[in-house]
């Protein structure tokens, strides 16, 4: 069954009565969908649903920069503009982590493989007593790599930083491990 708009000159049709009802509100300027948490009202139920999410912390995060939002549409728009992976050596920017990693490995990998008796950073001349410490320094300071990842999406250059974060993060859990989690939100704040 098709549901047609009865307003003169409109002629739009809809597959469901609810969609027609929402459409009619655009003609009458009626706003029957009211938020039960604030005073805002909307012509369409879908707009109210999007609004209600704003009363709660955002759940969607950009994997590149950590930007948080409420809707997939907003996240998609953000990700189109987000060029968060920037090379700390040459300044090139990449939209995808995999492209950034390929760039680093193909253009700057000599830093990790150069034989030397002293372990000196080629970029800032800082000296290290171990090659592994130099590699960690270059990756985290100059290449801005963060290989240690939490299930919540945050990334860290050092495992110790991830360990500190893990003690506070509610997303981190393994069966059999007693991991400290933040206290539950109080209902009195709502």
UniProtKB/Swiss-Prot annotation:
SUPFAM superfamilies: beta-beta-alpha zinc fingers. Coiled coil: none annotated. It comes from the Eukaryota. InterPro entries: Znf_C2H2_sf, Znf_C2H2_type. Keywords: Metal-binding, Repeat, Zinc, Zinc-finger. The keyword RNA-binding does not apply. One of its GO terms (cellular component) is nucleus. One of its GO terms (molecular function) is zinc ion binding. Signal peptide: none annotated. Transmembrane segments: none annotated. A zinc finger (C2H2-type) spans 4-27, 33-55, 85-108, 119-142. SMART domains: ZnF_C2H2. This is Zinc finger C2H2 protein ECU03_0790. It comes from Encephalitozoon cuniculi (strain GB-M1). The lineage of its organism: Eukaryota, Fungi, Fungi incertae sedis, Microsporidia, Unikaryonidae.
């Amino acid at each position: 069954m098709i549901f047609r708009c009865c307003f003169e000159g409109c002629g739009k049709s809809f597959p469901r009565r609810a969609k027609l009802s929402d459409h009619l509100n655009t003609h009458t300027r009626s706003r029957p969908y009211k938020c039960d948490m604030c005073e805002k009202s909307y012509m369409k139920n879908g707009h109210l649903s999007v609004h209600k999410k704003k009363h709660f912390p955002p759940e969607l995060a950009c994997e590149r920069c950590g930007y948080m939002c409420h809707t997939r549409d907003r996240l998609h728009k953000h990700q189109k503009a987000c060029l968060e992976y920037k090379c700390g050596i040459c300044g090139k920017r990449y939209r995808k982590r995999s492209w950034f990693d390929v760039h680093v490995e193909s253009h700057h990998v000599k830093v990790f493989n150069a034989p030397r008796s002293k372990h000196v950073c080629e970029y800032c001349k800082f000296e290290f007593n171990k090659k592994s410490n130099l590699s960690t320094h270059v990756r985290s300071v100059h290449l801005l790599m963060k290989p240690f990842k939490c299930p919540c999406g945050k990334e860290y250059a050092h495992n110790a930083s991830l360990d500190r974060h893990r003690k506070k993060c509610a997303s981190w859990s393994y069966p059999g491990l007693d991991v400290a989690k933040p206290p539950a939100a109080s209902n009195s704040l709502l």
